[in-house]
């Protein structure tokens, strides 16, 4: 009976090592790609978040227009980065000899989603986004963002050999 438990643990561990990166990649890509429709079409929810909440907040700090259309952090710019990160993650997951691409996608995804989490926590946007019509998402966007952050961090941990090798090459270049 003990051997069966050990065998099951070993097979689960083996499955996670072989396929876990796919689960994480598909989750991140799903969250990022499904949000593109909202970001690229100027949906009322997206307009409210970027132009109704974040841009006035940034303007109060002297950075007017950064979240408005054409701004450096506009919905379309953020969506473009999410699309690129998703594509890099998917290509890197599908092609074993291109795992470095997955690392770049995970790092890019982690950076983008860290910004989203920051703006949920430290701006008037809030954890539970209350739309202009008074409806609330109940924290769904924030929870999805946290899931993406964890997934990207786990992917970077799973592929740590790649970026640690890069770091080693960079730090020993001048030695």
Please describe what each predicted stretch is.
Residues 2-175:
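Membrane-interface extramembranous regions
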């Amino acid at each position: 009976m003990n051997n069966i438990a050990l065998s099951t643990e070993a097979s689960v561990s083996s499955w996670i090592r072989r396929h876990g990166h796919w689960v994480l990649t598909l989750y991140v890509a799903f969250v990022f790609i499904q949000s593109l429709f909202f970001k690229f079409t100027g949906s009322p929810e997206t307009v409210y978040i970027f132009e109704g909440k974040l841009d006035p907040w940034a303007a109060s700090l002297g950075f007017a227009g950064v979240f408005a259309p054409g701004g450096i952090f506009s919905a379309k710019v953020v969506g473009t980065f999410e699309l690129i990160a998703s594509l890099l993650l998917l290509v890197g997951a599908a092609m074993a000899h291109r795992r470095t691409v997955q690392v770049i996608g995970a790092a890019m995804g982690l950076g983008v989603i860290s910004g989203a989490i920051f703006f949920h926590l430290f701006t008037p946007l809030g954890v539970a986004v209350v739309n202009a019509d008074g409806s609330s998402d109940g924290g769904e966007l924030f929870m999805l963002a946290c899931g993406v952050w964890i997934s990207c961090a786990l992917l970077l941990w799973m592929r740590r050999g790649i970026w640690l090798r890069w770091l080693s090459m960079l730090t020993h270049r001048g030695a």
